[in-house]
Amino acid sequence: DHRDLHYPLRRQRQMCIRDSLGEVSVSLPSLHADAFAGELGRRVATMRKTGVTLAPECGTERLRRVVNKDVSEESLLEAARILYKLGWRSLKLYFMIGLPTETEEDLVGILDLAGKVARAGGGRPQKVTVAISPFIPKPHTPFQWAGMNSLKKLANKVDFLKSRSNDRALVLKWHDPRTSVLEGVLARGDRRLAPAVERAYALGSRLDAWSELFDLDRWRIAWQEAGLDPFFYAERERAEGEIMPWDHIDCGVSKDFLLKEWSKSQAGEVTPDCRVAGCLGCGLPCAGAD
């Protein structure tokens, strides 16, 4: 979150009032749980109510530590209380499934936490949309060494959540695991994927962002014709010493730092925000760095 987001919001509202453009409406996606405890909360309270998404990402504090999101359940519930007091009557929570070390307890925790958020304001439960997205390990992150869940595992986890979602206050929505598999292959692939991408296009894969037009079988044909195994790219856990297809790209953060963070994540150790704790030696220039 931008730490001074309330400044541009105030300026935007002033400009709209000055130019007689009417009331300001702002949608705030994927905010940290404590974002509304202060000036930002007071600022958005004066605006037309639109969508607000909080992103706990995981159903348990244990798994949030694994992904270095040190957000307590109580801080999330307090954020919900503040939003309800400010006038919101529905919230959206963003979660991921398929994260490293994830267990059934973590999946159950998604619905438990969402149910608590729905009732955080006291009285009648408020509507909470539970948005589920499969985790995709991305390059230049500590999880670039992790393997992605298979399509079958992801589909089973979505089915598990659907079968357990019997709270009328909750609306469960999910990202299609099939498109996530494709995203995982493309995100972690190398130059050998280029002919497969061209072949998939020739087979009709053009508007795959639209679910009604997406067909994973076209991509499977393209991968097979190119002699490629999607498991090799998406699902395989990578060795720490493996040379990655993107290693030649310098994004500033060192691979050694990412590897340390990968080890810490598996141990559930949280790395503090360098803006608070000081330079952590990631490789990017910052105040206090040597």
PLM regions and their residue ranges:
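Flexible, glycine/threonine-enriched loop-and-boundary segments that flank and lead into catalytic domains
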Residues: 27-43
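Radical SAM enzyme core and accessory elements
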Residues: 166-290
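Short, glycine-/Ser/Thr-/acidic-enriched flexible segments
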Residues: 31-35, 57-60, 97-98, 135-137, ...
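Conserved C-terminal portion of the radical SAM core fold
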Residues: 29, 51-52, 56, 70-141, ...
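Active-site-adjacent "gating/activation" loops or surface patches in catalytic cores
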Residues: 42-54, 58, 62
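Flexible glycine/acidic-rich beta-alpha junction loops that bind and position SAM and/or redox cofactors
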Residues: 36-40, 61-67, 97-105, 123-152, ...
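Single conserved hydrophobic/aromatic residue that forms the stacking wall/gate
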Residues: 1-13, 17
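Short, surface-exposed connector motifs at secondary-structure boundaries
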Residues: 21-26, 90
